[in-house]
Swiss-Prot record:
Keyword field: Isoprene biosynthesis, Magnesium, Metal-binding, Thiamine biosynthesis, Thiamine pyrophosphate, Transferase
One biological process term in Gene Ontology: thiamine biosynthetic process
Known EC number: 2.2.1.7
Protein known as: 1-deoxy-D-xylulose-5-phosphate synthase
Record's subunit section: Homodimer.
Binding-site residues, thiamine diphosphate: 78, 119-121, 152-153, 180, 289, 371
Enzyme class: transferase
Amino acid sequence: MSRPLTPLLDCVLSPLDLRALPASDLARLADELRAEMIDVVSVTGGHLGAGLGVVELTIALHYIFNTPDDRIIWDVGHQAYPHKILTGRRDKIRTLRQEGGLSGFTKRSESIYDPFGAGHSSTSISAGLGMAMASALKAEERRNVIAVIGDGAMSAGMAYEAMNNAGALDARLIVILNDNDMSIAPPTGAMSAHLARLVSRPSYRHLRERIKLFSKKFPKFFSEQASRSEEFARGFLVGGTLFDELGFYYVGPIDGHNFEHLLPVLKNVRAYPNGPVLVHVVTHKGKGYAPAEESADKYHGVNRFDVVTGKQVKAQSTRLSYTKVFSKALIEEATHDHKIVAITAAMPTGTGLDSFAEKFSDRMFDVGIAEQHAVTFAAGIACEGYKPFVAIYSTFLQRAYDQIIHDVSIQKLPVRFAIDRAGFVGADGATHAGSFDIVFLATLPEFVVMAPSDEVELMHMVRTAAVYDQGPISFRYPRGEGIGMDLPQRGEVLEIGKGRVLREGSRVALVCFGTQLSEVLVAADELAAEGISTTVADARFAKPLDKDLMRRLAREHEVFITIEEGAIGGFGAHVLQFLAQEALLEHGLKVRTLRLPDEYLNHGSPEKILSRVGLDAKGIINAVFTSLGYETRKTLQI
C-alpha cells in the first residue's frame, strides 16, 4: 500500500514552518498529520490511540508557543508521535521503537524539542514547575512552560502534589488537561467554548484580580462571600472548582479538535503575566481512525496492522505468554481459596487480570495509576487475613519502593507481588525495562524473591505464593511467550529457598535465575559436545538462597557462573557474597556473574540486545571458555 499524500505536511520541517502557515490551513494539516501517523504505526507498531487524539492540540501548541524556547512537556509520552513528526524527526519516524531508531517516548538526547524525557505517568507537572521556577530565577527570561497531562494520569498523587506546590508558589505554569475519557468533562459545545474564551482573556482575569483586591477593603465576611459567589458561578458555568482550590486559574472545557476554540484560548493564556493556569481540553482517543475510535483500549498500543481493516498482525503461536499463564494459575488458586484478591494499578489487560475480573469481579481491584496506593492498599487487605496479589510491571513497582519497605516488609505482611515485564522489554526501551526488581527486593530482610525458568515453574510459584503467609513474597517473569510446555491444571507448592539441578556435571556449574535457563541448556549441550562436563541448576530463589546447593556446586566445580536478566547487584551478587563469607573463593574457584550491563539499555529486539550483552547461549559459552583460559569461540553452531 502506498503512503498517503501529504503535500502540506511535506512543507513543515519544523515548528517555524508551521507558524508560517495561515490558521485556515491547520485543519488540512491535521488531516495529513493524522494520515501519516496511522501509516507509520501500521508499519512500526506502537502507541496509536493517544497520538491520534492530540493531533490538533499538538499543532495548536507549536503554532501558538515559541518552541523550543517555550517548553512543552508531554506526560508519559504515548501521545508524542505527532509532536516528533512536526519537530524535525519525520525522516526517522519509520525507525520508531527500533534499535538505533527513534524512541517511542520523548527523550532529551533525541531533540531540543523534548525538554523532558518520559515513559512513566504523572511527572510532567512537577518537571514543568521546576522549569518554570528556574526560568523565574533568570530575570532576563520569560519562558512559557506547558505540561500536557491526560485525565488518567491525574489519578496519581504526584500530579496533585505538583499542582498544590505550583499554586502555593504562584508559578507561571500552564497545564493542559487532556481529557480523553469524558470522565470529568462537562458539555463542550458552543456556549462552553464561548465562556472558555471569555474567562481566558487577560482583561477578565485582570478585572477578577481587581475585584478581589477591592473586596478586601470590606469586612472579611463580605469578601469571603464574594469569593464564594464568584467561584460558584464560574464552577457552575465552566467547572474547575477543584483546580481553583489548588491555586490554578481554570479555563475550559474546550473542544480539543476545533482550532477555532483552541487557538484563541491558548493565545490568551500565553499572555498571562503570572500564576498557574489549567486549560481543560476534551479530546477523543483514536480520533480520525474508526477502528481506534471504536476500540480505544485495543488500539492504545498496537502491533503492525492493516490500515484498511484495522486488523493487527500477530505471529501465530500455540505457546501462551507468561502473562496468560500467570492469569490462568491465579484464577485456579482463587477457585480454591476465597481469600485471594487481585490488585492492579491501571493495567488490568497488560497484567492479565482482566480475565480474573471476569470470574471474580468482587475480588479484583483496579486502583488507577497509583502504585504507591496499590501496595499499601494490599498491605491493609493482608492485615485482615486476605491474600492480595499485586500484579504490576517491574518498571512501575519502582514507584512504590517506600511502601514496599515501610508498609509491607517491615511489618512482615504477606503481600504477593506478581512482577510482569521483568528483564529487558524490547521496543519500549530504558523507561520500561524491568532491570532492577531483583536488586531492590532481594536486599530487604526476609523478603522471598523467586523467578520461574518456564511456564510450569511460574504456576508452581503462583501456588507457592498463595500458601505462603510468613511475609512478603515475589515472583518475576518476562514479557512474551513461554517455551511451550504442557501445563498442569494446578501448580505445586515449592519448598522455600530450594533450587533444582537439571543436569549433573563435574567441571562447570551454570546456575540460572529466571527464564534464560533455556539458553543455559543450549549452552550446556554445546559444551558437552566440546568435552566440557557441565552442571545446570535452576536457582528458583534469589532470596533465600539455596545455600546447600551453592556450597556443593562451589566445592565440586572448577568454574561457577550465574546467569540472570537483571542489573548488577542482583542474584549473582548475592551468590558471590555468600561464597565469600563461606570461604569458598579461596581455593581457585573461578566465578563469573552474567547479567545486564551497568547501563540503561535503549529500545530494540530483546533477542538482539540479550545476545549483544552476552545473555544468550553463545555468550554463556564464551564466558565458560574465557574462564577456563580457552580461546573464545567467535562462531558457534547452535
